[in-house]
Amino acid sequence: MMRPVVVKEKRVNESQIHVVEEEVRQAKTMDRDIVTHAMKQSFAKLNPKVMIKNPIMFVVEIGFIITFILSFLPSHSSSVPGWFNITVSFILLFTVLFANFAEALAEGRGKAQADSLKHSKKDVFANVVKENGNIVQVSATDLRKGDVVIVKQGEMIPSDGEVIKGLASVDESAITGESAPVIKEAGGDFCSVTGGTMVVSDEITIIITSNPGESFIDKMISLVEGAARQKTPNEIALNTVLTSLTFIFLIVVVTLPIFTNYLGFQIDTAVLVALLVCLIPTTIGGLLSAIGIAGMDRVTKFNVLAMSGKAVEAAGDINTIILDKTGTITFGNRMAHTLLPVGNETIEQVGKWAAISSVLDETPEGRSVIEYVQAKSISYNRELAEQGEFVPFKAETRMSGVDLQDGTKVRKGAVGSVIEWVQSQGGTIPKDVNQKADFISKEGGTPLVVAVNNRIYGLIYLKDTVKPGMRERFEQLRQMGIKTVMCTGDNPLTAATIAKEAGVDEFVAECKPEDKIAVIKAEQDKGKLVAMTGDGTNDAPALAQADVGLAMNSGTTAAKEAANMIDLDSNPTKIIEVVGIGKQLLMTRGALTTFSIANDIAKYFAIIPAMFTLAIPQMEALNIMKLTSPLSAILSALLFNAVIIPLLIPLAMKGIAYKPMSSNALLGRNLLIYGLGGVIVPFIGIKVIDMIVGLFI
């Protein structure tokens, strides 16, 4: 009997191994295709109309053209041999190609994601309900805003919309990657559905909310392909600074021959071009676009759709995060925490009647009571409750329970409601009921009174549990200089208790959705950038007001349209990770800019002595690297300038390692690593290249 079992397990394992191997093979193939496409695009981007968008690399391309033309003209210079011009021109060409490759590689990853999304779009037909009630089948591409469509079990939702009738389980794995279906129903904050998702049970009627080309998937494709990508304000500002530096160095190099002629010697044009290319910030100039695209790509891989690069950058500058208590800081389900008997009652009696009142209660609270009683080994008669008539919770009564066959009425519910119910039947109220209810409220819990007919037995202490690790995460945000504000509809006592347990900096109790706008504006008036999450229509104004608004994919269309980011997993706590990604993007750009500018120091000591040593022998003192010859020094500096770009591509794509710490600590750390490193690495790199080049010159 054992052998078949063993063989079966072996087959399953082999099957799993084959699946994993196939996934790895496909991933390698996709990476190979991306690299191949990026290499082709590197040459396509040499078009001056494309290159002029990056002024720094455009100057390098012009330098390539000049030196390439000079290599075919008769040389009147005795300072450099004939092969020097062509060598310089090819080094400059590869410098531009490496920069183009970095940008094309980042774009290629986005296009690969877009292709997978395009494959998820299938030819779908929709059952449209006409005004006369007739149902007509049309192509999804013919649907318009306002059309009413019926979607049955097993059918694909044809376009974005909102449920106006019915309830169904929807498989959103094509969009979110989450295999578990989600419930969509008419009304409330969970009525929004996305085109391309599948109804796996029941039937719903939806009203279409987007025209062709405007659906959620269409927007995702457009964004990840980069068609909708615009340069962010920080990127534009940095690009302006780098372009200004390039212009200044260009003026210096162009006017330099005037001074050298005055001193009685001439500098070859190719040497001047080499000097210019080595002085301008080509490293960050070649990687700047790739860093921005890769930042958007990292957010997308995290299952968050950013509507613009500006939103990702803003996340990195956030000073304050507004968080809902329910579902974000806490689990959102109040669970039975303990039982408190009143008067002379025992905990066994409270547990018995609490369980009987909850047997038919399918709410999370009801199930948690049963689990608690069973965990405490308190006995109760389940069959007695199952044979009775369930009394569901209503907003008017604020109670639920069961009427047993012998006429006994068991109830659990809000303190005031149960007390009134007991008093209406002639019962007396134990003195410690309100005292213990106040204690539970002060602890941040919710008290439910358990009563049978005209007698109160005790209270159930329901507690909305804080998610594990939240205190540590808020401490990390505090180290980053980010303030956390919890907004909740709870009373001040409950809010204060939860805030203390979770470790948030501030809280706003009895907060209505419209109050969030006031909280956001108050922070913005102090010059702070604010982030918040939301999913309901009533959250839309606040999401629009916030600098970073993260809407849940499960939320309403209004919320998603107001936000500048959408979380496909509908996990409100992800705002913390989004802030981290934004900071990583800004730090990567800043670190590589520092590294690029610091490089100039080493290149200065390489190329300046090489230019002037023959005419001014005293300049040899600046040759601290003891480079082989002037020509070797110039070529080594140019080669290092070119090679460093592809070497830094992985760092630009992945982002530098980020650890939560204060701004001053981060600045000091990055200056040490990328500032000092930007000085030391070129000295070593240029010297090594010079030793190799010296063998051939």
Swiss-Prot record:
Q: Tell me which NCBIfam families the record gives.
A: ATPase_P-type, kdpB
Q: Which HAMAP family match?
A: KdpB
Please give the SUPFAM superfamilies that the UniProt record associates with this protein: Calcium ATPase, transduction domain A, Calcium ATPase, transmembrane domain M, HAD-like
Q: What class of enzyme is it?
A: translocase
Name of the protein in question: Potassium-transporting ATPase ATP-binding subunit
The free-text function statement in the UniProt record for this protein reads: Part of the high-affinity ATP-driven potassium transport (or Kdp) system, which catalyzes the hydrolysis of ATP coupled with the electrogenic transport of potassium into the cytoplasm. This subunit is responsible for energy coupling to the transport system and for the release of the potassium ions to the cytoplasm.
Tell me the protein family, please: Belongs to the cation transport ATPase (P-type) (TC 3.A.3) family. Type IA subfamily.
Topology within the bilayer:
Multi-pass membrane protein
Membrane spanning stretches:
55-75, 82-102, 245-265, 271-291, 605-625, 633-653, 677-697
Q: What is the lineage of its organism?
A: Bacteria, Bacillati, Bacillota, Bacilli, Bacillales
Q: Where does ATP bind?
A: D361, E365, F393, K394, A395, E396, T397, R398, M399, S400, K412
Could you say which residues bind Mg(2+) here? Answer: D535, D539
> Which key words tag this protein in UniProt?
ATP-binding, Cell membrane, Ion transport, Magnesium, Membrane, Metal-binding, Nucleotide-binding, Phosphoprotein, Potassium, Potassium transport, Translocase, Transmembrane, Transmembrane helix, Transport
Q: Partners and quaternary state?
A: The system is composed of three essential subunits: KdpA, KdpB and KdpC.
Q: Does the keyword Glycosyltransferase apply?
A: no
EC number, UniProt record: 7.2.2.6
Where in the cell is the protein located? Cell membrane
Q: For this protein, what reaction is catalysed?
A: K(+)(out) + ATP + H2O = K(+)(in) + ADP + phosphate + H(+)
